[in-house]
Structures are given as C-alpha cells and as structure tokens.
C-alpha cells in the first residue's frame, strides 16, 4: 500500500504483483460516506415508501423505508408504512451509505454503524456477527470473547482483521467505539438539524484501518505528518504492523518510483489494451456499465474458439482489475467473445470470479449466456475515479467525460515539481497549454510560489498553444539571475 499526500490531494494505491489494482483519491471536497448527520425530514413519499431528508448538503438525502430501524429496534420487526414512521419536520439521525451522484442526493440509513480496527459497532442491532472469511475455529474463539463483552441491545460485527487478536485488543476496540457512540449521541441531543455529528476518518487512516493487514508486505508514506498519524494509529490498534510502515524520502516521487503512472493513465481511458493484442472497451451510463471484449489484432494460433477463449480469459483478469481500479459499482454487463463450448464459458466465468475474490467490495456474478454476456453487480458507494478525475465534456452536451480543470491543474503542477526536483539547473522556463496556464495562474493559486520556496529554484511559465492540455514543455533551463532564467 502506498500513501501519497501533497497540497492538492491524498492518493492511496494498492499494488499487487507490481500492478496498480486500487487507487483512491481524496481532495478537499471529501466523500461523505460514513458521516452521521442530524437531519430533518423534508418530504415523505408514500408511493415510493421513501423520504427526503435535509442533512445540510446541496441536495436532500434519500431514505428508503427498509433503511429505517424498526421501532422495536430489532431485525425482523413487522414492516410498517413510511408515513407511520416519519413526518415532515421530524429530526432524526442518519448515516450516509452512498455519496451524491449526478442528479441524485446521498442515500442514507438510520442503522448507524461505527467501524473500528477489529469491530463494527451497530448501536441499534442487538446482533453479534463474525466475518465469514475467518475459519470456523477462529470464529468460535472470537465469538466466545466478544459475546460476554457486548452490552445488551447493542450489535457488533467482528471484522476479518480481528483474526488472532487478543481479548484485551478486542475489548479496547469495543470500549473505544462505545465511547464514540456516546459522544455522537450527546452531539445529536445538543444539535440543531441539519448538522454533522460524526465525521468519518480521512482517506489515509480509513484505508489503513479497513484494509491494511498481514496480507500487505509494506506501507510506504511520502508525507511526514501522514506517516506519523499512521504510525500513531497502528501503535494503538495493531502494533505488530508498525514495522511494515516506511517513509519515502527519495527525490523521485513515490508513485513514479513504483512505475504507477501508466496504470493511472489507463484508469480513465475508454479502451484498455490487452497484452495479447486485444482490448476491452468500458462505457459507463446512468443505468449500468458495459464492458466489450474484442480480439483486436490477436488472431490466435489454432482456431476461432481457442482465440476467443484465450482473449476472454485475459479479459476476465483485466476487467476485474479495472473494476477495482476505477471503483465501478452498480450493474455491470460484460460482453465476452462468443464461444460454443459450455466448458469454455464456465472457465471464463470461473476466472472472473477468482479474480474478483481479491476485491474487498461485494460482487455477484451470474452465469454466461449463450451470447457471451455476463451480468454482475458490484456494491456502489462512491462515484469512483470517474467522479473524482473527470467532468462532463462541455463540447458534446455532457455525453462524454474529460479530465476536470482541477485534475489537469494538479497533473501539470505535479509535473512542474518533478522538473524542478529532478533537474540540475536553478531556473526554468516552461510552456503550458493556454487553458492550463490560466488554471495555474488563477487568482489565489500560489503553487508556483510554493514550488520556488520548496526547491529554491525559479520557474516561469508561458502560454503556448502548441502544448497539450496536460503537457509541461521545457523551453529553457539555466541559472537564476535578477532578470529571470538565463540560458545555460
């Protein structure tokens, strides 16, 4: 796991076999998933058995009746109509399940969950569950420890990370979560809707808590303050993992040193090449994501069925990786190349299922149809990399996606830093695309001044229409003088 933090954003990458398989990006406008709000019911819709709740965001949140904790406070209580549960103007505590996406507001629930390192507290559940990924013997051990500790009426899920954890560690995690819940309740009692009463951890700590464990060989962090936060968190929650945390101190950027840029570049492309010469095409719509598999230049060595099987098997691996990398959720339809032999169809689905088993996000895969179609679902929580890195294209009525202004500015400013840090000269003149030049020199953006202060080098930029939108073209490098950059 790699954590890179700079003035613009935090990026967390998961690398398997030297390939980027997961990438998470957090900018000042953070995800609100996991946040708990004291909200106010704005409208109740009996026909949809749902309600709109004002939680202080741009759009009202959407609450389904099935996401409302039953008055009895236990699972399996008789279902009731939403109009008997909620009234306009009523205040209630809700937690965000899905970020706002497009024209839709956030999706929320009243079933609050507070995650810790080993446990997830469910204050309204009364249910104790243990991760099914753990062996039966370990599940029995953990159950015997946890059940006597959990207060009556409170629910707990024991996470996979609890494997091998000592009783004192589990008890400490539970006590921390119970204290946290009491603070959330107190803030909700004293608050006035709409108001946030609990904010989820930042991206770096959240992924360290939820994902980093014994399966990772190392965790490398390139920012001193983030490194110290991560080490402090692990010392309290998983001391044995602290020795796996490393500080990146090289001049070369962390992501550069691991060669991740080519994989990042493909994460927003519609077409992704396969090593055999084939490719997959990914199209995202409001309703679903379609993935089309093509042989491209690959013609095989035997017959059409063999060519289709080999391409489909390679595509199954890449599709699973791209779904994780792009964090694509919802309904996904994969159009594999037609194959006549049912055994070949089963082999491709088995390969896809095996690759998806690495995914922490829940997926369900159907059998392949005779037409080569595989329908699957992947839990949809955020807008994925598309939502962070791109925006609707202004030239085609919003039907396409292009890199957002913020993304282009960050890429160019990061490239400028690499020029200054990696170069031996003390002054540089670089050309930028006119639109990018305007972004870098926008009022209030002091990146150039910060780069000069950080590196002790001077950089001047000019607008050059021959330069690409995210290109940094080095025009002159030399030594700094009172007049600017002198040719060296």
Where are the predicted features?
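Active-site phosphate-binding and catalytic loops of NTP-dependent enzymes
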Residues: 1, 22-32, 77-84, 99-108, ...
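Charged, low-complexity terminal tails
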Residues: 2-108
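A short, contiguous, amphipathic alpha-helix enriched in charged residues
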Residues: 14-36, 87, 136-140, 257-269, ...
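Conserved glycine-centered short motifs in functionally critical loops
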Residues: 47-51, 55, 59-60, 96-122, ...
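Metal-dependent catalytic core segments for phosphate chemistry
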Residues: 64-65, 232-261, 266-271, 275-313
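A short alpha->loop->secondary-structure connector
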Residues: 70-72, 76, 103-116, 137-138, ...
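Loop/turn-to-beta-strand initiation segments
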Residues: 88-92, 155, 192-193, 244, ...
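Charged, low-complexity intrinsically disordered tails
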Residues: 127-264, 268, 382-488
């Amino acid at each position: 796991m790699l954590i890179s933090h700079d003035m613009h954003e935090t990026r967390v990458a998961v690398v398997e076999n030297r390939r980027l398989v997961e990438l998470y990006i957090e900018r000042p406008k953070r995800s609100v998933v996991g946040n708990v709000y004291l909200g106010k019911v704005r409208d109740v819709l009996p026909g949809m058995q749902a309600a709109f709740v004002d939680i202080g965001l741009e759009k009202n949140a959407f609450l389904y009746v099935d996401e409302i904790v039953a008055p009895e406070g236990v699972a399996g209580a008789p279902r009731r109509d939403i109009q008997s549960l909620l009234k306009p103007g009523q205040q209630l505590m809700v937690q965000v399940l899905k970020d706002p996406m497009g024209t839709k507001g956030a999706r929320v629930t009243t079933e609050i969950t507070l995650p810790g390192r080993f446990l997830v507290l469910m204050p309204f559940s009364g249910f104790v569950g243990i991760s099914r990924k753990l062996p039966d013997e370990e599940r029995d051990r953990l159950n015997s420890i946890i059940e006597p500790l959990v207060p009556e009426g409170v629910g707990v899920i024991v996470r996979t990370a609890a494997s091998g954890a000592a009783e004192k560690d589990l008890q400490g995690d539970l006590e921390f979560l119970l204290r946290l819940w009491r603070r959330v309740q107190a803030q909700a009692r004293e608050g006035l809707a709409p108001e946030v009463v609990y904010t989820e951890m930042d991206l770096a700590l959240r992924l360290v808590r939820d994902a980093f464990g014994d399966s990772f060989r190392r965790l490398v962090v390139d920012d001193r303050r983030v490194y110290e936060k991560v080490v402090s968190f692990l010392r309290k929650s998983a001391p044995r993992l602290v020795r796996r945390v490393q500080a990146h101190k090289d001049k070369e950027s962390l992501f550069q040193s691991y060669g991740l840029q080519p994989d990042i570049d493909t994460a927003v492309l519609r077409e992704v090449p396969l090593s055999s010469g084939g490719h997959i095409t990914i199209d995202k719509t409001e309703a679903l994501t379609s993935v089309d598999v093509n042989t491209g230049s690959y013609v095989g060595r035997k017959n059409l069925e063999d060519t289709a099987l080999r391409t489909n098997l390679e595509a199954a691996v890449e599709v699973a990786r791209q779904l994780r990398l792009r964090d694509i959720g919802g309904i996904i339809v994969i159009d594999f190349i037609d194959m006549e032999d049912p055994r070949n169809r089963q082999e491709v689905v088995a390969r896809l299922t095996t690759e998806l088993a690495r995914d922490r996000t829940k997926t369900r895969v159907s059998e392949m149809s005779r037409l080569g179609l595989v329908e699957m679902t992947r839990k949809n929580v955020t807008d994925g990399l598309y939502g962070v890195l791109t925006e609707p294209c202004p030239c085609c009525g919003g039907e396409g996606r292009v890199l957002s202004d913020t993304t282009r500015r960050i890429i160019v400013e990061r490239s400028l830093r690499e020029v200054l840090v990696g170069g031996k000269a003390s002054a540089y003149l670089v050309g930028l695309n006119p639109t990018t030049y305007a972004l870098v020199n926008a009022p209030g953006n002091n990146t150039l001044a910060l780069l000069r202060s950080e590196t002790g080098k001077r950089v001047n930029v000019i607008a050059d229409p021959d330069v690409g939108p995210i290109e940094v073209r080095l025009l002159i490098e030399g030594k700094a003088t009172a007049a600017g950059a002198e040719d060296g």
